[in-house]
């Protein structure tokens, strides 16, 4: 639980806090809900190249429909976003193709979230909005004015935010929970850092800060930081040798254009199969050791502005560009522009760890806590989970039962056999909602039921202490870097699994092939 809680801090710590700075996420295009596929719908006659499909269907994803209207509206938003970033907008057909691919993946993620019982209510959206506004140092009303000034309705933004929260919680459960970093791996990593003093700065973090983190300030020193963008030419699972060869040829053509000096972000927007394609391929900034080994080998020695050779992974062919990098003197700055008012820059996954290296001991207030977790699912709604925990809390406060016994009986967390004991928790070890609820408790006090990305919790604080955590912080940072190194390929693998297991009828793609054959 502790590893998972720590690794998932990015939901509200980065993704949500940066959404205003990045402008409206493209998932706002989903503001028009999909209509259920009509029963008995028969495949329409093939339209002439200049005609629209008579049924208005752009794609079918399992049992869901993506309409042409959704694609058009999403394309308008994507075009506006690319223009804000200073990226050349692809031609209309290419843009719609890229947008539809994104909508298909978002629909698959939404279906998976529904299957796992992940839901986001209005109160959670309000909480996220308040947090975004607070971190951008504006009021929710001012934030709303900024959003609407950009041409996006408040209802669209709220829906987009709800979708992003839900999708992030899904990724946390489906991807992050399967990334396990052992103590032996941490030991080996730290030994390697000792042999490489420059890289070792990545694990020397400042003391964890109490609740509200502030926007990142330029550091005076730090580890090697790398800002990467990519173009991905995906190789579908089960592709034949001829298909792989054709995709390699396509990737080599894109690489040649990038090496020749064509704008990388524009190439990515028009051609990349990666989830960040419509952000110009931007993957964000991380310490060098936080990137996958393949990426480090290909781009670790490149200067800012340089492009790697072709990198082959299990998902296809990657072309990497070093957008920016910094050693110990100055932090890397994300290169894409973002509208006011926030100074932060967006990242596809999360910001890299803080790079400042403290001198001397790191003293923090640790909390010894335990909890009971009930996860939501198709058979356990939010209301049911909350009510069950309220009943347990009443029994605990009445003295009829012991907390550890209730945890062993009801908790769905890995700490259940230990009576829900989390041990000594450092600031920043848990997701912000959990930490905020825990920090509000006095010793021996039990919280009301509270919601985190994992489900509903009861938390009890046992005691607090001041403690020097220099070694623990170093190990925690090492574990985080190792986690981040695996997160990118793990996420791509998960997306590929979702795609390969689904029924996808991409009618725009079929129409394009038909037109090519008729030429």
UniProtKB/Swiss-Prot annotation:
Pfam families, alphabetized: Rotamase, Rotamase_3, SurA_N
Annotated signal sequence range: 1-31
Gene3D superfamilies named in the record: 3.10.50.40, Porin chaperone SurA, peptide-binding domain
Location(s), subcellular: Periplasm
GO BP annotations listed: Gram-negative-bacterium-type cell outer membrane assembly; protein folding; protein stabilization
Reactions this protein catalyses: [protein]-peptidylproline (omega=180) = [protein]-peptidylproline (omega=0)
One term of GO molecular function: peptidyl-prolyl cis-trans isomerase activity
Span of domain PpiC: 223-324, 364-463
Top-tier EC class: isomerase
One GO CC annotation: outer membrane-bounded periplasmic space
Biased composition (Low complexity): 31-45, 197-207
UniProt-annotated stretches for the region Disordered: 31-50, 196-221, 328-361
Keywords: Chaperone, Isomerase, Periplasm, Repeat, Rotamase, Signal
Enzyme Commission number(s) of this protein: 5.2.1.8
Database matches in InterPro entries: OMP_Chaperone_SurA, PPIase_dom_sf, PPIase_PpiC, PPIase_SurA, SurA_N, Trigger_fact/SurA_dom_sf
UniProt comment concerning the protein's domains: The PPIase activity resides only in the second parvulin domain. The N-terminal region and the C-terminal tail are necessary and sufficient for the chaperone activity of SurA. The PPIase activity is dispensable for SurA to function as a chaperone. The N-terminal region and the C-terminal tail are also required for porin recognition.
Role summary: Chaperone involved in the correct folding and assembly of outer membrane proteins. Recognizes specific patterns of aromatic residues and the orientation of their side chains, which are found more frequently in integral outer membrane proteins. May act in both early periplasmic and late outer membrane-associated steps of protein maturation.
Designated name of the protein: Chaperone SurA
